[in-house]
Amino acid sequence: MNLVSKLEETASEKPDSIACRFKDHMMTYQELNEYIQRFADGLQEAGMEKGDHLALLLGNSPDFIIAFFGALKAGIVVVPINPLYTPTEIGYMLTNGDVKAIVGVSQLLPLYESMHESLPKVELVILCQTGEAEPEAADPEVRMKMTTFAKILRPTSAAKQNQEPVPDDTAVILYTSGTTGKPKGAMLTHQNLYSNANDVAGYLGMDERDNVVCALPMFHVFCLTVCMNAPLMSGATVLIEPQFSPASVFKLVKQQQATIFAGVPTMYNYLFQHENGKKDDFSSIRLCISGGASMPVALLTAFEEKFGVTILEGYGLSEASPVTCFNPFDRGRKPGSIGTSILHVENKVVDPLGRELPAHQVGELIVKGPNVMKGYYKMPMETEHALKDGWLYTGDLARRDEDGYFYIVDRKKDMIIVGGYNVYPREVEEVLYSHPDVKEAVVIGVPDPQSGEAVKGYVVPKRSGVTEEDIMQHCEKHLAKYKRPAAITFLDDIPKNATGKMLRRALRDILPQ
């Protein structure tokens, strides 16, 4: 079984059930499956072969689902890319990923025209029309490669032969966010994606009664598995939100009686801070899921109290398809914890020599299971560093309690060493978030001539008039001296990536320290 065959099975069993809703449109499972087959046929008719690479530069839309599953059905490897990346970033991924075809919105045509000479391997450009007129390219060479999404979907004279994938075939190359160095392309297999989506769906009890809000970006692995693949494996309905905003999410949840919402902590913070947010806005929600970054306990508690919902924190990473841990809702959760290992996945905390550590000791979290990638594309040294004896070394520092619950302490590379003492940014950030006038907070290490490094805090205040002294006094009550920020800078906003994860590296690069 794989994602495509499971969706086919669902379409056969529940043809008239609604697979997805987008704005005022809906699509049944039978309709979705037919579009997927036609897209797979169209790709093959256009010259794409099993093993070729196709990049998706699309926002949240039914086109993303059709293209994703259609490519997999034709045996083609999908390379999802954030369409808002810079030309340099996109060019790197298209080149490094050996992309042969691109699917993107028509507004991306000028971008492709400006860089096509540096992309000789790209032979096909499929544009999704956003207006009535077909996009036109000035360059005749580009015009030769162009077609539209609608043309690819036109029924062919005869259905092509579907390419049944081998479980270990690469299905997706997912580029990491590149917090250090160049982004790395994690090769996720058909088995990786199916096993994780299936296990997540089972763990969360997803079924045809669920309406799942898809407000995270589809090109991100968190959304790909939790908001798209898992619901479609379960016969649920995917409620596609083109772009996250608190007002639109509240409206969507109410109109469609959504039952599951997944987001990163920043999204929950925006929802919580929204002036019109009230308890009955989430009255239909049976489950909220948080991932992508650690959620401050103060925010989790306040959000649950305001909206009357339960938030389950989980943990995952691109290289693990992504989910490895979830807080169980059948035997109690622990705020601040990422929960316990999900079915078929092992997690453990080890020392620098790979030896498992006892409960409560901090070490590196490593993961093993059918969800773990087979390696980084064209990066054997990085693969060897990340995968050892079947275990994925995550680079995250964690601890485990006696009940088997795991707690992320911080990224290894984000740890701050002050006068020889380890300071974990998350611990300091939890204290900052507990201040009533702090809306967002993040800390980094900055050079210090006396202690080697010092803690520097960045805060987005809830109101004007908050002073550095206010924050410092709060920290003095809750933190040892060496853990306290040496300085606080107030910002209007903290730099974030496409999924809302705060970017410490941007603070180091562009903000005064």
Curated annotation (Swiss-Prot):
Q: Which PROSITE patterns match?
A: AMP_BINDING
Known pathway: Lipid metabolism; fatty acid beta-oxidation
Question: What InterPro entries is this protein classified in?
Answer: AMP-bd_C (IPR025110), AMP-bd_C_sf (IPR045851), AMP-binding (IPR020459), AMP-binding_CS (IPR020845), AMP-dep_synth/lig_dom (IPR000873), ANL_N_sf (IPR042099), ATP-dep_AMP-bd_enzyme (IPR050237)
EC number(s) on file: 6.2.1.3
GO biological process: any one? fatty acid beta-oxidation
- The signal sequence is none
Cite the GO molecular-function annotations of the record.
Answer: ATP binding; long-chain fatty acid-CoA ligase activity
What the record says about the induction of its expression is: Repressed by FadR in the absence of LCFAs (fatty acids of 14-20 carbon atoms). When LCFAs are present in the medium, they are converted to long-chain acyl-CoAs, which antagonize FadR as to its binding to FadR boxes on target DNA and thus derepress transcription.
Q: Which reaction does it catalyse?
A: a long-chain fatty acid + ATP + CoA = a long-chain fatty acyl-CoA + AMP + diphosphate
Please name the top-level EC class of this enzyme.
Answer: ligase
Q: Which key words are in the record?
A: ATP-binding, Fatty acid metabolism, Ligase, Lipid degradation, Lipid metabolism, Nucleotide-binding
Gene3D superfamilies from the entry?
Answer: 3.30.300.30, N-terminal domain of ligase-like
| Family, as annotated | Belongs to the ATP-dependent AMP-binding enzyme family.
**Function text:** Involved in the degradation of long-chain fatty acids.
Q: What is this protein called?
A: Long-chain-fatty-acid--CoA ligase
Which gene codes for it?
lcfB
